[in-house]
C-alpha cells in the first residue's frame, strides 16, 4: 500500500515541477495606424517545436502561458489574413512583447479561400468536419469519431480527452438534453460544417465567470440546412436463421434561428435501427424505487460483446423534440419519447461456489430469457438565461411497463419464471440563480413521486406448484437547496450552501403462501446539511480552488410492522471536500480532488423477511442500519496541441471505504442466500490510466495508445466465514485508422487485459486478447466494398484451454447521385458462429458461460 501511495505522491510532485517551468508572455497587436487588431494568431516556437499559441482579443491584447526550459531559443510569430507575418526572437527576460502588423501589398485577382481544419479562440476549438470525414461517413456520429480527441462509445456517449461532455448544442441551442444520440445518429454529416469543442464550459450566463472542467459540443450546420426542413429515411429487409428481418424509419429536422425541431419514428427487428438513440447520457432523474431494488426485473447475464451478436430484438420508437427561443434569453422546450422493445437471449452456465470443506458446490443451468418493455417520458422545460439571473423549471412525467420470462433447466428440472412490473412517476425541478454585484443567490426545489403498484414474480416447477413473490410501494422525495455567496475579495468568495432532503416510503413484499415471508415497511427520513466553503479563483480564470466542510444532520424513522421491527436514529457527521483546477495555458489542465463522505443505511435495511429474486436465490437484509465512510483522492492531467493534433490524458485515484456491514452469500446445492452481516471492515482501491493520440492530417490517419491499472482489496461473507480477496488488473491497447488515399480506408484496434484474483484459497491469473479491424475500398465514387472482423481469445488460469471466437462481416454499398439514394447490402457473421464460451471470476464465485449467438444474416438497406 505504501508503494501505491508513494506512486501517487510522485505523480503529484511531477505536476508541481511542470508548473514551475511555465512562462508568461503578454502584449498588444496593432496595425500601422495604431488600431487594435483582433484575431491575430500568436505562436511561440523553440526551433521548429510549437510551445504554445493563442489569439488576440477585440482590444488587441493577448496573453500566453507556455512551458520552456531555460536554454531554449524562442521565437514569437504573429500572423493574420491580409497582413504580413511578423517574427521576433524572445529573450529570457521578456515578459511583454507588442507587435505592429503591416497590410500585405500583394493583391490577387482571384482568391480561393480554404477554411483551416482547426481553429482556436480562447477555450473553444473549432474543427471543420469536412477535413476529417472519410468515405462511408454518413452521419454526424461517424464524423465525430474522426475528430482528434473525441471518442464515441458503443452506447453513443461522446467524450473529449476522456471526459464526458456536459452539454450538446446545435447552433447554440440545447434541443435534446441528454438524448443527443437522436442528433448524432440522424443528422447527415454533409449538413454539418463544424464541431466546436467548448472547454471549461458554463451552461448558465450568470456563472460564466466561474472556471469549470466541463466540456460541451456545439454543432455548426451548413447554411442550406438552416433554410428549410430536411430528414433521413431508410427501409431494410433481410433474413436470418430465425426468420425475416425488417426495418423502416424516418427522421425529420428543422433548425431555425429561433426554433428547432426533431421528430423520429422507427420500427425494426434487426436490433440495429434506432438502437441506443433514446439513451440519456447526462445524469438526470432517478425513477427507480425501493420496490424495484428489492425485486429487480429478470434480465439474466450478458456477455462482453455487442448485443446485436447474441440478442433477438424487436424495437419501436418515437420521439418529438421542439425548442422555441423567445426574447430576453427565454425559451420553451418539449421532449416526448416512447419506446417498445422485445428482446431475448439464451445461454448455459456452470457456476462454482466455494465451500468451507475445500469442495466447490457446482450448479449447471440452461437459461432462456425474454423481456418486453414500454417506456414513455414527457418533459416540458422553461428556461430564462440572462447575465444576472437564471430561472429554470422542468416538469417530467414517466411511465414504465415491463414483463420478463425465464425458462431455466437445472438437473433435469424445468423452472418457469414470469414477472410483470408497472411503474409511473412525476417530477418537478425548479432552479433560480441571481447575481448582483458581490452577491450570488441560488434557490432550488425538486419534488418527485414514484409509484409501483405492481411488481409480481411467478414461479412454476415442471409446470406445477405455482407460487408468487410480490413487491410494491410508493416513494416520495423532495430536495430544497439554498446557496448564498459573497465576494470578499476579487479572487475570494465565502459561500454557504444549505440543503434539506426528505423521503417518505411505503414498501410491501409478500411471498404467496408463507405468512412469515412478509415485509411491511413504512417510514421517512430527513437530511439537513450546511456546507461552509471558500472559493478562490484568479482573475484570468486560470486557477480555481474550492474547500467545503459539509455538516450534516440525519433523522430516520422506519418500521417493519410485519416483523415487529422499528428503528429511530439521529446522526451528525462532518466531512470535507477539496477541488482544484489549474489551467496554466490553453494546452494544459490539471485537476485534483479529495474528499471524505459519510453515508448511512435506509429503509431497505429492514427487509429481514426473505425475498425470492429468482427460482434459487433469496435476499435477506440484516435489520441494522449500516454506516460507511469514504475517503478518496484523484489527480488528472491533460495536454493538447490542437493545431498539431496531439492529445494526452492521465489520471490516478485512490479510494478507501469503511463500512459497518459486510455483504455475502450462503450457498447450498438448492439455494443461494444473499445476506448481510454486521461487522466493520475496510475496502481499498487504486486506479491509474493514461492515453496518447496523434492525428496526421495529410494522411487522415489517427493513432492512439492507452493503458489502465487497477488494484482492490475487499472483504465479504461466504459459507459462515469472512473472506478477504485481492484483485488487480492492467489493460494496454492501441487504435489505428487511416484514409491515406481517397479510395482506401482501414481501421484496427488491439487490446490486452491481464487479471489476477487472490484469496478464498485461490490465486488465479487470466488474460484476454481482443482485436477489431475493418478495410474498405471505394470505386468510381459510387461503389464501396467493406470487410470487417472481430477476434477475442481468453486464457484460463492453470494452463487450461483458451477460449476464443471470431466474426467476419462484409458489406457492399452503392450511392446514387440523383436521386440522393444509397443501397447497402450487409452480410453479417459470415462464419456462422453460433456459440461463445467464456469464464468470469467474481470476488467469490466462478461462472463458465456458453452463449447462443445469432447466425449468418443478410440485410439490404435503402437510405434516402
Predicted regions and their residues:
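Membrane-proximal, glycine/serine-rich, low-complexity loop/turn segments characteristic
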Residues: 20-21, 28, 34, 59-63, ...
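Short, ordered, surface-exposed loop/turn motifs in non-cytosolic proteins
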Residues: 32-46
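A short, solvent-exposed loop/turn motif at the edges and junctions
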Residues: 46-49, 73-89
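Short, acidic Ser/Thr/Gly-rich low-complexity loop/linker segments typical of extracellular
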Residues: 49-61
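Face-selective signature of the C-terminal outer-membrane beta-barrel domain
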Residues: 323-341, 370-409, 414-561, 573-576, ...
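Surface-exposed extracellular loop regions of Gram-negative outer-membrane beta-barrel proteins
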Residues: 451-453, 554-557, 586-631, 654-670, ...
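Conserved C-terminal beta-signal and adjacent last beta-strands/turns
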Residues: 731-754, 764-864
Amino acid at each position: 500500500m505504501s508503494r501505491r501511495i508513494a506512486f501517487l505522491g510522485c505523480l503529484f510532485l511531477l505536476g508541481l515541477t511542470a508548473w514551475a517551468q511555465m512562462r508568461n508572455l503578454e502584449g498588444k497587436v496593432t496595425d500601422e495606424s495604431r488600431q487594435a487588431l483582433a484575431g491575430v494568431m500568436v505562436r511561440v516556437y523553440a526551433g521548429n517545436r510549437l510551445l504554445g499559441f493563442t489569439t488576440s482579443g477585440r482590444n488587441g491584447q493577448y496573453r500566453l502561458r507556455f512551458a520552456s526550459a531555460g536554454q531554449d531559443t524562442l521565437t514569437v510569430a504573429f500572423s493574420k489574413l491580409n497582413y504580413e507575418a511578423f517574427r521576433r526572437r524572445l529573450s529570457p527576460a521578456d515578459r511583454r512583447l507588442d507587435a505592429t502588423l503591416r497590410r500585405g501589398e500583394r493583391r490577387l485577382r482571384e482568391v480561393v479561400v480554404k477554411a483551416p481544419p482547426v481553429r482556436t479562440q480562447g477555450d473553444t476549438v473549432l474543427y471543420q468536419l469536412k477535413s476529417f470525414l472519410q468515405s462511408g461517413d454518413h452521419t454526424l456520429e461517424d464524423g465525430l469519431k474522426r475528430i482528434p480527441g473525441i471518442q464515441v462509445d458503443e452506447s453513443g456517449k461522446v467524450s473529449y480527452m476522456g471526459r464526458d461532455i456536459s452539454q450538446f448544442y446545435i447552433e447554440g441551442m440545447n434541443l435534446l438534453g441528454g438524448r443527443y444520440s437522436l442528433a448524432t445518429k440522424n443528422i447527415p454529416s454533409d449538413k454539418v460544417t463544424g464541431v466546436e469543442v467548448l472547454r471549461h464550459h458554463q451552461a448558465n450566463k450568470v456563472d460564466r465567470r466561474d472556471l469549470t472542467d466541463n466540456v460541451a459540443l456545439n454543432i455548426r450546420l451548413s447554411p442550406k440546412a438552416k433554410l428549410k426542413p430536411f430528414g433521413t429515411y431508410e427501409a431494410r429487409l433481410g433474413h436470418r436463421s430465425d426468420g425475416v428481418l425488417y426495418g423502416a424509419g424516418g427522421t425529420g429536422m428543422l433548425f431555425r434561428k429561433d426554433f428547432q425541431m426533431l421528430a423520429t419514428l422507427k420500427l425494426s427487428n434487426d436490433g440495429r435501427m434506432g438502437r441506443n438513440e433514446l439513451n440519456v447520457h447526462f445524469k438526470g432523474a432517478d425513477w427507480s424505487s425501493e420496490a424495484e431494488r428489492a425485486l429487480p426485473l429478470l434480465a439474466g447475464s450478458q456477455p462482453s460483446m455487442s448485443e446485436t451478436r447474441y440478442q433477438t430484438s424487436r424495437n419501436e420508437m418515437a420521439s418529438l423534440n421542439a425548442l422555441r427561443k423567445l426574447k430576453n434569453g427565454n425559451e420553451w422546450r418539449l421532449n416526448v419519447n416512447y419506446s417498445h422493445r422485445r428482446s431475448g437471449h439464451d445461454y448455459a452456465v456452470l457456476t462454482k461456489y466455494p465451500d468451507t470443506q475445500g469442495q466447490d458446490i457446482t450448479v449447471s443451468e440452461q437459461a432462456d430469457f425474454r423481456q418486453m418493455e414500454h417506456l414513455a417520458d414527457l418533459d416540458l422545460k422553461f428556461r430564462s438565461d440572462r447575465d444576472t439571473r437564471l430561472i429554470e423549471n422542468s416538469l417530467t412525467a414517466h411511465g414504465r411497463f415491463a414483463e420478463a420470462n425465464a425458462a431455466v433447466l437445472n438437473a433435469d428440472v424445468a423452472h418457469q419464471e414470469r414477472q410483470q412490473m408497472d411503474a409511473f412517476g412525476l417530477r418537478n425541478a425548479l432552479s433560480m440563480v441571481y447575481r448582483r454585484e458581490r452577491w450570488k443567490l441560488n434557490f432550488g426545489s425538486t419534488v418527485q413521486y414514484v409509484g409501483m403498484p405492481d411488481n409480481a414474480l411467478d414461479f412454476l416447477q415442471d409446470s406445477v406448484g405455482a407460487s408468487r413473490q410480490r413487491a410494491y410501494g410508493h416513494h416520495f422525495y423532495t430536495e430544497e437547496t439554498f446557496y448564498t455567496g459573497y465576494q470578499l475579495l476579487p479572487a475570494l468568495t465565502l459561500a454557504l450552501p444549505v440543503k434539506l432532503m426528505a423521503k417518505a416510503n411505503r414498501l410491501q413484499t409478500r411471498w404467496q403462501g408463507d405468512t412469515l415471508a412478509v415485509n411491511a415497511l413504512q417510514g421517512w427520513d430527513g437530511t439537513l446539511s450546511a456546507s461552509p466553503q471558500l472559493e478562490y479563483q484568479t482573475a484570468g480564470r486560470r486557477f480555481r480552488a474550492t474547500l467545503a466542510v459539509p455538516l450534516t444532520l440525519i433523522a430516520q424513522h422506519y418500521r417493519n410492522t410485519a416483523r415487529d421491527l422499528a428503528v429511530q436514529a439521529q446522526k451528525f457527521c462532518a466531512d470535507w471536500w477539496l477541488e482544484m483546477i489549474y489551467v496554466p495555458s490553453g494546452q494544459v489542465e490539471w485537476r485534483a480532488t479529495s474528499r471524505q463522505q459519510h453515508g448511512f443505511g435506509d429503509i431497505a435495511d429492514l427487509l429481514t423477511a426473505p425475498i425470492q429474486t429468482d427460482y434459487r436465490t433469496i435476499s435477506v437484509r440484516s435489520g441494522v442500519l449500516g454506516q460507511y465512510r469514504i475517503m478518496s483522492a484523484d489527480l488528472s492531467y491533460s495536454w493538447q496541441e490542437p493545431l498539431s493534433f496531439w492529445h494526452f490524458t492521465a489520471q490516478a485515484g485512490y479510494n478507501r471505504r469503511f463500512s459497518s456491514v459486510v455483504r455475502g452469500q450462503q450457498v447450498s446445492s438448492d439455494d443461494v442466500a444473499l445476506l448481510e452481516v454486521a461487522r466493520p471492515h475496510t475496502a481499498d482501491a487504486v486506479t491509474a490510466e493514461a492515453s496518447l493520440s496523434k492525428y496526421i492530417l495529410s494522411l487522415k490517419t489517427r493513432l492512439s495508445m492507452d493503458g489502465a491499472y487497477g488494484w482492490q482489496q475487499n472483504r465479504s461473507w461466504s459459507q459462515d466465514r469472512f473472506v478477504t480477496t485481492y484483485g488487480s488488473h492492467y489493460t494496454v491497447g492501441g487504435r489505428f485508422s487511416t484514409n491515406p488515399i481517397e479510395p482506401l480506408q482501414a481501421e484496427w484496434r488491439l487490446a490486452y487485459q491481464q487479471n489476477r484474483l487472490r484469496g478464498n484459497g485461490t490465486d488465479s491469473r487470466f488474460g484476454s486478447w481482443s482485436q477489431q479491424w475493418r478495410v474498405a475500398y471505394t470505386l468510381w465514387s459510387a461503389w464501396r466494398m467493406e470487410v470487417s472482423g472481430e477476434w477475442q481469445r481468453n486464457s484460463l488460469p492453470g494452463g487450461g484451454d483458451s477460449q476464443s471466437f471470431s466474426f467476419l462481416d462484409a458489406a457492399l454499398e452503392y450511392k446514387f447521385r440523383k436521386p440522393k439514394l444509397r443501397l447497402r447490402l450487409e452480410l453479417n457473421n459470415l462464419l456462422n458462429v453460433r456459440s461463445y464460451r467464456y469464464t468470469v471470476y467474481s470476488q467469490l464465485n466462478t461462472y463458465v458461460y456458453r452463449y447462443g449467438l445469432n447466425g449468418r444474416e443478410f440485410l439490404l438497406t435503402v437510405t434516402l
